[in-house]
């Protein structure tokens, strides 16, 4: 089938319409059920990680290999010309784009992925995270997991907990779920790490219900999805981190009274915001969520690199 994502840059979740999201999720489900090990057999994809990553990088590279693509790139920019010789990001991308069919990129600077599109010569750039800004492929696997566990992406009660200021995953996920009808949001965070005002303004403009809370217990009985996040030490000064890191911790005992099919999600890595006794409960779904990253990213790569896709 012809698809609207062919050769498209994927920088922000807002680059994707509701119909685009549904296409990616449907493709992910097909690839999960029916692997396609030669779909990208003659493609070369650059995996360029200017910032540390475990799950996102390995998930993306596994996705590439399982579709038959060749993979080039780096996991540490310190050993590149950009890191050692002071080459600009623009020049780095201009050169890499002459070698490959697509560029997957993570960078600590907000807006770096969007900047890269200006120098990629039309080669698609897929944002694997740019600072505290956007993480669209994490959002796709989150949506895929929510749809699998809840059977829908509409009329959901979704709580987001922890670092909502710097946590790019919650920004992207809120924007994505706002494209679907009837969803309600509960934001649970210390004042220093509250959801940015532009997200709240967006929800208000769309007439979407949201509320602020100071404790997980306030909403446990009402939610379908409890999306936990870690306090990101690397984005805070030491005194601020010490003050807020243990303020919101989920324990197995806290899950009493939760809806039977409520799922706890987390973009990982987990530090101490979810105790290990939660892992043994039927609500814990963060490891399955991480595994779904393979299928969501396979779907996106397949769509971006194939003008027509019949699965």
From Swiss-Prot:
Gene Ontology molecular function terms on file: amino acid binding; aspartate carbamoyltransferase activity
GO terms for biological process, alphabetical: 'de novo' pyrimidine nucleobase biosynthetic process; 'de novo' UMP biosynthetic process; amino acid metabolic process
Reaction(s) catalysed by this chain's protein: carbamoyl phosphate + L-aspartate = N-carbamoyl-L-aspartate + phosphate + H(+)
Key words, A-Z: Pyrimidine biosynthesis, Transferase
Disulfide bonds: none
Pfam family, one: OTCace_N
Residues bound to carbamoyl phosphate: 55-56, 106, 135, 138, 268-269
EC number: 2.1.3.2
Gene3D superfamilies, per the entry: Aspartate/ornithine carbamoyltransferase
Residues annotated for L-aspartate binding in this entry: 85, 168, 230
Keyword Transferase belongs to the record: yes
Coiled-coil regions listed: none
Biological or metabolic pathway of the protein: Pyrimidine metabolism; UMP biosynthesis via de novo pathway; (S)-dihydroorotate from bicarbonate: step 2/3
Subunit relationships: Heterododecamer (2C3:3R2) of six catalytic PyrB chains organized as two trimers (C3), and six regulatory PyrI chains organized as three dimers (R2).
Function: Catalyzes the condensation of carbamoyl phosphate and aspartate to form carbamoyl aspartate and inorganic phosphate, the committed step in the de novo pyrimidine nucleotide biosynthesis pathway.
Family that this chain belongs to: Belongs to the aspartate/ornithine carbamoyltransferase superfamily. ATCase family.
NCBIfam families: asp_carb_tr, PRK00856.1
Protein name: Aspartate carbamoyltransferase catalytic subunit
């Amino acid at each position: 089938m012809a698809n609207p994502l062919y050769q498209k840059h994927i920088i922000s979740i807002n680059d994707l319409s509701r119909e685009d999201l549904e296409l990616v999720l449907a493709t992910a489900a097909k690839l999960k059920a029916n692997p396609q090990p030669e779909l990208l057999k003659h493609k070369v994809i650059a995996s360029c990680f200017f910032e540390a990553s475990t799950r996102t990088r390995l998930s993306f590279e596994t996705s590439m290999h399982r579709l038959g693509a060749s993979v080039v790139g780096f996991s540490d920019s310190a050993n590149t010309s950009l890191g050692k010789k002071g080459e600009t990001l623009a020049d780095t991308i201009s050169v890499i784009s002459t070698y490959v069919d697509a560029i997957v990129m993570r960078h600590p600077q907000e807006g770096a992925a969007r900047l890269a599109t200006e120098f990629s010569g039309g080669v698609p750039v897929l944002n694997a995270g740019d600072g505290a800004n956007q993480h669209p492929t994490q959002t796709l696997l989150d949506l895929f997991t929510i749809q699998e566990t809840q059977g829908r992406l509409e009329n959901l009660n979704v709580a987001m907990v922890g670092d909502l200021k710097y946590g790019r995953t919650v920004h992207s996920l809120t924007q994505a779920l706002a494209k679907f009808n009837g969803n309600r949001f509960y934001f649970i965070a210390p004042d220093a790490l509250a959801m940015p005002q532009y997200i709240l303004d967006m929800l208000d403009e769309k007439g979407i219900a949201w509320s602020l809370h100071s404790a997980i217990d306030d909403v446990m009985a009402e939610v379908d999805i409890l999306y936990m996040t870690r306090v990101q030490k690397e984005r805070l000064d030491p005194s601020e981190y010490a003050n807020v890191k243990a303020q919101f911790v989920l324990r197995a005992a806290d899950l009493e009274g939760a809806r039977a099919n409520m799922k706890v999600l987390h973009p990982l890595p987990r530090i101490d915001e979810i105790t290990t006794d939660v892992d043994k409960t039927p609500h814990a779904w963060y490891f399955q969520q991480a595994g779904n990253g393979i299928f969501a990213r396979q779907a996106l790569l397949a769509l971006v690199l194939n003008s027509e896709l019949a699965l």
